[in-house]
Amino acid sequence: METGPYAPLRSRDPRRRRRRQARRRLVLLALVVLVLAVVAAVLVARAGGGGGKDGSSSKATGGKPAGATPKPITPPPKVWVATKADPVRVWAGGDSLGGELGYGLAPVLEQSKVFMPILYYKESSGICRWDFFDWGRKMTSIMHTARPNAVAIMMGTNDTQSIWDNGVWTAYGKPAWKTKYAARVGDMMQTMLDGGARRVYWVGMPIMGESWRNSRMKLINGIVKEQAALHAGVQYVDIWPLFATANGTYDAKWRAGDGVHLTVAGQERLAKTVFAALKKDWAPYGLPSAKPTPDASPSVSASASSSP
């Protein structure tokens, strides 16, 4: 081992040399990490992963900015202007409230001369209990047999309960319940569109007389609204303000004694709102003017139009 004045410097203090090498490796590693972070940030920004202008995102909205409404990625099916020669077949129904929607809407559709009503509803049915009544299968059958061009559907009254799915209960309100409920609603919407409906008007739940129901109705409405936004051609029809007072509380004058169902006046009020949505799409230039015939009997006409 050399010990004279000309011995190599590295042999004088090998520990110092190792420390310098370690520092250089750390600096190099830090530079590599920094470069990779910059590249990753650029790729995410180009992919739109940052969401809105502020780049915020949320797992709850699937990477979309908080509060953003999801948009369908395809344009809605084309519609035509409804005429007497080429009328629009409108299926209306759902649960018992959907039945009342149909009762109110049918006379208005018939009187228009350009819309043809088709009605069906099932009491006590809904999205949760397809072991009792399977709306998924029923809607497939309806689209195949009735072949409506437009659908006005209303259900959710009976969905303040757990979901039954192939022998397994999913407790109401849990994350898994919300996921399954949304999936069933979305599947039904897609069934209608795939079955030939060019427009689907999914009517939300109204405010209820029993206050405990309202948070649950709002949960259902929120899920339906979100799914409607994901399906081109589906419109969510909000009727909550329609049956509330000016200060947002329950308005009993339109409702039956159970605080859920509608009076005849309430049915007509609901039908007017849904009919307005139909006309906006299918009769943008207005309806043909009615020309009464000389031998028409007003009493007979009124009686015939009021029957579903």
PLM feature segments, named:
Residues 1-91, 281-308:
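N-terminal secretory targeting modules
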Residues 80-176:
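Conserved SGNH/GDSL esterase-like catalytic core that processes O-acyl groups on lipids
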Residues 206-308:
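Catalytic His-Asp segment of secreted/periplasmic serine-dependent ester chemistry enzymes
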Residues 154-160, 164, 188-220:
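Active-site segments of SGNH/GDSL-like serine hydrolases
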Residues 106, 110, 114, 144-147, ...:
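Sec-exported extracytoplasmic/periplasmic mature domains
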Residues 93-96, 120-123, 153-158, 197, ...:
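Active-site-proximal beta-strand/loop segments in catalytic clefts of secreted hydrolases
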Residues 75, 133-145, 182-191:
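Alpha-helical scaffolding within the catalytic cores
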